[in-house]
Amino acid sequence: MSAVTKRSGSYGRTLGVGAVLVLVLATLAVVNVYTNLAPEMSGSQQSMLLSGLVSILLIVAVALLFVATIIGRERTAAVETLAAQARQIEQGELDVDLATNRTDDVGDIYRALAVLRDSEQLDRQHGVSAEVVAQYCETAVEISNGNDDSRLEENVDDPQLAELAMRFNEILDQRKRDAEIDSR
């Protein structure tokens, strides 16, 4: 069982304990009302009072069950969705949509997860950029050693590095053309 499932289960248990506590308090109130009023009533009135109080208690129990179910399902569904999105990010899928309008703690977790995802995207981009820069340095060394056929890779994800490579390659091409003209 994952930590997220344990926590959502814990939340459900807390909600259930709260509902049971309210039901116990309502039962104690019903018993208190009945024990205070029943001695002064006739048998049929006592029966009607008991019937009415039991009906009220049942209505409270059903209402609590309904509210607990609705709140629990909504909360559990939100946590399960968030857990699924976190698993996608964990597996490397960084294009997961984490936009939310929630203002509760689940919304806070969504926003925190979005920050982590964005940070991972930047780290990946910087890693790729660092690789490209290292390749560019190697190519520059080759060119300085006389390899006029070396070129910088223009097909990279970073638009600024692609622009740099294109312009650098244009300069090399022009230099090569000028050298050919001078050699004639």
From Swiss-Prot:
Ligase among keywords: no
Principal location: membrane
InterPro entries referenced in this protein's UniProt entry, alphabetically: HAMP_dom (IPR003660)
Sequence intervals crossing the membrane: 14-34, 52-72
Subcellular localization, as worded in the UniProt entry: Membrane
GO biological process, one term: signal transduction
Induction remarks: Expressed constitutively throughout the growth phases, both in presence and absence of white light.
GO cellular component, one term: membrane
Tree of life domain: Archaea
Intrachain S-S bonds: none
Every HAMP domain range: 73-125
Something else known: Is lacking a methyl-accepting transducer domain found in all other photosensory transducers.
Record-stated family: Belongs to the methyl-accepting chemotaxis (MCP) protein family.
Subunit description: Interacts with Xop2/SRM.
Annotated protein name in UniProt: Probable sensory rhodopsin transducer
